[in-house]
Design a protein with these regions (language model features):
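Sec-dependent signal peptide recognition
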Residues: 2-10
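Extracytoplasmic soluble-region selector
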Residues: 17-231
């Protein structure tokens, strides 16, 4: 939870002996923002604000919310913020003439689907180098197009990933699981690498998954790549 304080200008210059009070004795606004400060198009989050009196206690006053940019809308009374279009959205909480500092959010494309790009089943020799690429793409329907800089999880699920040392790993990090970010075209790519000295498995299954910013599973998660090895 991110918090920001907004104080009336007279408070900054009046010294400790006196405070100029605004509406209903409010001299400051404490704003609560659930992290992260990134919002997908169509996603809504609840913001909170607490008017403060000169003693730092809660003051009884209505807070009005304002969206400065057209990239997001916010309910003036409830503080529910909704992403509308890609870009930066600046939000402010107000009580009378007192306004909080502008709070910025990055509005990004919504991750609507995770797809396998091209083949999902491959056959390769154990001596082949490099091994085939496993390519996925994260796509958005709002706005229509690829989703860049979004994490795709590749996880070796067969052979048993708990066996150590693993006979095969992902080439991007040398582990059995890796989160690979998508590029500007929405694609994420990895491949396999055999562990030197280990007995190659007959086949390898790699499961893909992805989540949205606040944990919702992206449709298409759970698909598999399969690589069969030949001598």
């Amino acid at each position: 939870m991110r918090r920001a304080l907004a104080w009336l200008l007279p408070l900054l210059v009046a010294g400790c002996s006196s405070l100029d009070e605004g509406q209903a004795g409010v001299v400051g606004i404490e704003v609560q923002v659930p992290g992260p400060d990134t919002l997908e198009v169509g996603e809504s989050i609840q913001l909170g604000a607490r008017p403060l009196d000169k003693n730092g206690d809660s003051a009884s006053a209505a807070v009005t919310w304002v969206s400065v940019d057209p990239t997001a809308s916010i309910d003036p009374s409830t503080g529910v913020l909704t992403g509308l279009s890609v870009g930066t959205a600046r939000i402010q909480a107000t009580v009378g003439s007192l306004g909080s500092s502008l709070i910025s959010f990055a509005i990004v494309p919504r991750a609507d689907t995770l797809q396998i790009a091209g083949d999902s089943i491959f056959t390769a020799s154990v001596t082949a180098s490099p091994l085939p690429n496993f390519t996925t793409v994260v796509f958005s329907f709002s706005p229509l197009g690829p989703v860049p800089t979004h994490g795709v999880v590749y996880a070796i699920t067969s052979p048993d990933p708990l066996v150590s040392p693993a006979p095969v790993v992902l080439s991007t990090n040398g582990q059995v699981t890796d989160t690979v970010p998508t590029g500007t075209d929405g694609t994420a790519v990895t491949s396999l690498a055999l562990t030197p000295g280990a007995v190659p498995p007959e086949s390898v299954v790699v499961t893909i998954s992805s989540t949205r910013i606040r944990g919702v599973v992206v449709p298409g998660s759970g698909q598999h790549f399969i690589l069969h090895f030949t001598p």
